[in-house]
């Protein structure tokens, strides 16, 4: 159970980081 919970937390954190990385780069390209 603990392993599945950790996996879910890691999965959500990775997705959030991916979205956060896409946002600044997209805005940076528009600004450039």
From Swiss-Prot:
Pfam families: TED_complement. There is a cross-link at residues 27-30 (Isoglutamyl cysteine thioester (Cys-Gln)). GO terms for molecular function: serine-type endopeptidase inhibitor activity. It is found in: Secreted. Keywords: Bait region, Disulfide bond, Protease inhibitor, Secreted, Serine protease inhibitor, Thioester bond. One of its GO terms (cellular component) is extracellular space. It comes from the Eukaryota. Homotetramer, which consists of two pairs of disulfide-linked chains. PANTHER family: MACROGLOBULIN / COMPLEMENT, PREGNANCY ZONE PROTEIN-LIKE PROTEIN. Is able to inhibit all four classes of proteinases by a unique 'trapping' mechanism. This protein has a peptide stretch, called the 'bait region' which contains specific cleavage sites for different proteinases. When a proteinase cleaves the bait region, a conformational change is induced in the protein which traps the proteinase. The entrapped enzyme remains active against low molecular weight substrates (activity against high molecular weight substrates is greatly reduced). Belongs to the protease inhibitor I39 (alpha-2-macroglobulin) family. This is Ovostatin.
